[in-house]
Amino acid sequence: MALLTPACYVSSDGGSGTVEQDSRSVDLKGAKSVQVQIEMGAGELVMRGGAAQLMDADFRYRARDGKPEVQYDVTGSRGTLNVRQPSHHSIGNNDKNHWELRLNEDVPLDISVKMGAGEGRLELGNTTLHNLDVEVGAGEMKVDLTGHPRGNMDVRVRGGVGEATIRLPKRARLDIEAHGGIGEISARGLDKRGDRWMNEPSGEADATIHVSVNGGIGQINLICE
């Protein structure tokens, strides 16, 4: 069960409903690896490392949308963390929904993110990430994996309408497949080889990162740095 800290802030939202804030912490409970599943209908999502246990989170949300639901279970040595908006949330004024999630940097993570609309910033280069699966309906998604990778990764990003920017570490061996529907694919620090983008790692490669990006309508930015 997640350890909860009660909401500490309530304000009026200028006629569109009460805005509340809540902070929560989740203990690792001895898990050796964790599957993290995030479901956000609309809003702004920020994810990064920095948690002492499994997760420290700060939520801002409209009261009428309901408090974000957090559930964590451990089976054997594998943990499963679910963070989601209640199913009855509304879509308008999604700027009132803001989640900041800080994750443990040392436990191996498989992360799945599903967003309906909004903006996501996933700064996960300092975590022990193995798999990342991102699906966004409409909006902007920024994924930053720069730093010193701790192992091989598989990354999948699927977008409907909007922009996706993916920053990748030049110390890793990169193998990227990107397909845009209606829009442009921009690549920096990468060489195009057939229908793929690759790099020449600086020094001995720390890891191999496989990336698959599929965009609907919008821009795809691939940056190796």
Residue spans of the language-model regions?
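A structural feature that tracks compact, well-ordered secondary-structure segments
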Residues: Q37-E39, S112-M115, L122-E123, I166, ...
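Post-signal-peptide N-terminal segment of Sec-exported extracytoplasmic proteins
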Residues: D27-Q53
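C-terminal motif of bacterial Sec signal peptides marking the signal peptidase cleavage site
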Residues: L4-A7
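Right-handed parallel beta-helix
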Residues: S112-M141
